[in-house]
Amino acid sequence: MTVDQVRSRRPASTSVAWLRPGRGVPLPEAEARERTVRRRVGIVWGLLVLNVVGYTGALVHIPGAFGKGITQGALPVAILVALTINRKIVLRPNVFLCLAFLLAIEAVITALEPHSFGTVYRTFRMVEFVAALWLLTPWWGRSDLLLVRCHLKALAVVLGSVLLGVLIAPNKAIGTHRLIGVLWAVPAAQVAHYAAVIFGVTAVLWFCGKLPSRVTLMIVSAAGIILIATRARTALVAMIAALLVAGLSLIVARARVRKLFAIAGAMTAIAVITLSGFLASFLARGQSSSQLTNLTGRTAVWGPLLSFPRDKFQEIFGFGLSNDSFNGLPIDSNWLASYEAQGLYGVVVCAIMLVFLLALAYFQPRGVQRALALFLVTYCLVASFTEVGFTGPSPYLLELALAASLLIPPATARYRH
């Protein structure tokens, strides 16, 4: 075959084909479009994660308004990017997002009462957040776990900034004996949350044979070290409970899960017998018995919150979205924060969201998607007693949405196109 004949067989135009990096082999048009969509979905999800990370400070001084503008401005940018791949605004029916939308609608109704600008603004952001999630529904239920991979990458970037902060300013990062983010301020509890989710999701993927053992060991080792360095009890307990539930859902079908549970049970028994004193001291973090009894001062806020006088409307619908504080102190409980912000209505809707996802997972066939969803929902359920986040844009609401995306079938051609 002559050179001219070879050239004649090449595509006449590169407008419908992209080149593979470093190969010079053109991609088919459909594959090129799919790659573009995957990248933009990843950008949207990364912007949603940036939005929920929030801004409380940085190693290099950034004006507060500018820092908050970066994180809060990520939400409308995420919607705009989502619209570039969902131009016809195709929305798949979804019960979970309907429940989240009910929370947003209730927040709008409550915001019509005389409130500060902050309440109205938080309500608007909640509506934006649910809208962004709904724009991504055509890519929910994918067998390639696209959104899970996007979530892991986004959390890895956050934890990467935490580790970089340890190298740059170790005294600030671990000066309080708890690992925090200093390059971009991330509290210890939030660092622990991200590390626990990466640890658990990676472990579940290994349970199902989706990751090789060597890669899994590297990831869970790094995430485990970060989690231990934060000395966060809630994240540790929630992760263990979630892994137990996810593992039990696979224990019949996966031999490696049965072996791991047997080994973990034996090691736990040995650790409890030989290291019980050290473990108790480590988890106590130097706190007294009274501090542990009142959950590090949380109950001192919960009592006055519940006894605060309310009229019938405020008891049912709450006072509107706030910064999850009461008298200037953090509430640190999703259920009490929901009661404060959206009343009994918010508490009931949050409970229905969790029950619906657990029931939906129960009727799914055994597999990686069901196990991942069970891990995420169980983690959020356990953490919800001492963490906040279901009634507003937060990592917990984002992870519940991720769990919901794993429990629905892939989109049909009608929604994909």
Task: Give residue ranges: language-model regions.
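Alpha-helical transmembrane segments of multi-pass inner-membrane proteins
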Residues: 148-174, 186-249
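A juxtamembrane structural motif centered on a specific transmembrane helix
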Residues: 1-41, 85-88, 401-417
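Transmembrane alpha-helices of multi-pass inner-membrane enzymes
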Residues: 375-381, 390-417
